[in-house]
Amino acid sequence: MVVSLAGRDVLCLQDFTREELETILKTAEMMKIWNKIGKPHRVLEGKTLAMIFQKPSTRTRISFEVGIYQLGGYGLYLNAQDLQLRRGETIADTARVLSRYVDGIMARVFDHKDVEDLAKYASVPVINGLSDFSHPCQALADYQTILEKKGRIQGLKIVYVGDGNNVAHSLMIAGTKLGANVVVATPEGYEPDPKVIKWAEQNAAESGGSFELLHDPVQAVKDADVIYTDVWASMGQEAEAEERRKIFMPFQVNKELVKHAKPDYIFMHCLPAHRGEEVTDDVIDSPNSVVFDQAENRLHAQKAVMALVMGGIKV
C-alpha cells in the first residue's frame, strides 16, 4: 500500500499509525543511502521551511538547516527576537502570516501547547522540533538507528533509564507502536505522563509488544537489547539540578549497570550528555555506544519527515 503523509503535522507520534511510522523510517533509510552515494534528491526545490526557536539547539538547528538545503529548499531561522510574539502578536496570527510565506514550519518550543496552536492556525505542515511533552524527530532517528544496528524493532527489549521526560515519551510511543518491549525505569515521582503510559499500554496490546514501568534500574536493564538515557535536568529545570543529581544517581548508566544487559546491547543518548552524571565515559565511549549514529540520523529522519509532509512524496 502506498502511504501519503502530504500536509500532515508532526506534533506527537501517537498521531501516526504503525504503517505510517514504518514509512517514515523507510524513507529515512532511503535518504541516508542517497546522501551517501551522492544521488540528488532535491524533492523540496524552491520550498521554504520556517524554523522557530524559542530555545537554542545544536543538533536540531544544524540538522534541519542542512536537511532542507540537501532537499533543495531553504531554511529560515527565526528566534524569539525575530518574531512579534514578545510584543503581543498571538501565535495564531503568527501561524497565519507565516503560512502565506513558507511551505512548512518547524518549531522548538518550551510549551507543547505552543506547537499545537501553531498547527491549529497554520495552513502549512508544522513539525515539532522539541517541546516539553514530545520529541518526535529524536525518536524517529532513534528507531532508524536501532533498525540499522539490530535489523528489527519487533520483540527487542528497549530500556529507558532516567527522567520520564519528553524524550522518554516519544521513545515509549514509537517503540510500543512498532512492537518493541519497552521498559522505563525512573525514580518514584519522576514517571512519564500517565496519558503516555496509557497510550504505550494500548499501543503494545495492538502491536504485540509490551510496556513496563519500574523503579529499579538493575531489574529494568536485565537482558536489554537497548539502554537509553537522557539528562536528569532538562532546559528550564536548572534550579532543580542539584536535587535531581542526588535523586537520580542510583539511575546512572555505568559499567556495573550495563553488565546486566545482553553483551551486544547498544547504548543510546539523545545528546548533549552530562558525562559523569546520567552516563559514565566508559559507557558512552564504549564500542556498544551508538550516540553519534543517532545524532547523524537526526538529519536523515528529519529529511524524511520534511519530504513526506512538505513535498508529498509517496512511499
UniProtKB/Swiss-Prot annotation:
SUPFAM superfamilies named among the record's database cross-references: Aspartate/ornithine carbamoyltransferase
Keywords associated with the record: Amino-acid biosynthesis, Arginine biosynthesis, Cytoplasm, Transferase
Keyword Transmembrane helix: no
Residues bound to carbamoyl phosphate: 57-60, 84, 108, 135-138, 270-271, 298
GO cellular component terms, semicolon-separated: cytoplasm
EC number(s) recorded for this UniProt protein: 2.1.3.3
Residues annotated as binding L-ornithine: 166, 230, 234-235
Location relative to the cell: Cytoplasm
MF terms in GO: amino acid binding; ornithine carbamoyltransferase activity
GO biological process, one term: arginine biosynthetic process via ornithine
Annotated pathway: Amino-acid biosynthesis; L-arginine biosynthesis; L-arginine from L-ornithine and carbamoyl phosphate: step 1/3
Catalytic activity: carbamoyl phosphate + L-ornithine = L-citrulline + phosphate + H(+)
Domain of life where this protein originates: Archaea
Family designation: Belongs to the aspartate/ornithine carbamoyltransferase superfamily. OTCase family.
Cross-referenced PANTHER family: ORNITHINE CARBAMOYLTRANSFERASE, MITOCHONDRIAL, ORNITHINE TRANSCARBAMYLASE, MITOCHONDRIAL
Role, per record: Reversibly catalyzes the transfer of the carbamoyl group from carbamoyl phosphate (CP) to the N(epsilon) atom of ornithine (ORN) to produce L-citrulline.
Name used for this protein in its record: Ornithine carbamoyltransferase
Gene that this sequence comes from: argF
